[in-house]
Amino acid sequence: MRERQNSYEYEDLLACGRGELFGPGNAQLPLPPMLMFDRIVEITETGGEFGKGVIRAELDVKPDLWFFGCHFKGDPVMPGCLGLDALWQMVGFFLGWTGGSGRGRALGLGDLKFSGQVLPHVMRVQYHIDMKRIMRSRLVLGVADGWLSTDGEIIYRATDLKVGLFQQDAAAQAGK
């Protein structure tokens, strides 16, 4: 397990995807192409709307990103589910970063609103998570609100994003 930082570059995120950041069997990010951000620019255990922690990440948008070629031909747009998954990825990363053990699984959300699209001409996507609750018992559960913006304009808002960290056998059950 590496020393905890307050920001992470792309190579650090890849190390997390390989299971090298938080130790074997613990929270991992997906590897490309499903890793949906290029860097974490801020992560803290305090602050944010609820005083429970903040995580901010960014994705540099390039017209040749894999999803633009297939979603949709002649009308390229990033699938909304990928932006949502990025928010879940960040909550899981936060849980591992704070010492939670187990494998991360998205468990749902309260509400989701889209008011714009991520298109190839966008320069940067910014993601923001405000942690609301962290419960540590047989399972580690994080609940957060988050948003996604393109070039500074918020276009997705999600409430009560839920991610759990499960031990290996329980993670297999959660995925059923």
From Swiss-Prot:
It comes from the Bacteria. The keyword Zinc does not apply. One of its GO terms (cellular component) is cytoplasm. The active site is at residue 71. Its EC number is 4.2.1.59, 5.3.3.14. It catalyses: a (3R)-hydroxyacyl-[ACP] = a (2E)-enoyl-[ACP] + H2O; (3R)-hydroxydecanoyl-[ACP] = (2E)-decenoyl-[ACP] + H2O; (2E)-decenoyl-[ACP] = (3Z)-decenoyl-[ACP]. Keywords: Cytoplasm, Fatty acid biosynthesis, Fatty acid metabolism, Isomerase, Lipid biosynthesis, Lipid metabolism, Lyase. InterPro entries: FabA, FabA_FabZ, HotDog_dom_sf. Pathway: Lipid metabolism; fatty acid biosynthesis. It is found in: Cytoplasm. Gene3D superfamilies: Hotdog Thioesterase. Coiled coil: none annotated. GO terms for molecular function: (3R)-hydroxyacyl-[acyl-carrier-protein] dehydratase activity; trans-2-decenoyl-acyl-carrier-protein isomerase activity. One of its GO terms (biological process) is unsaturated fatty acid biosynthetic process. Necessary for the introduction of cis unsaturation into fatty acids. Catalyzes the dehydration of (3R)-3-hydroxydecanoyl-ACP to E-(2)-decenoyl-ACP and then its isomerization to Z-(3)-decenoyl-ACP. Can catalyze the dehydratase reaction for beta-hydroxyacyl-ACPs with saturated chain lengths up to 16:0, being most active on intermediate chain length. Homodimer. This is 3-hydroxydecanoyl-[acyl-carrier-protein] dehydratase.
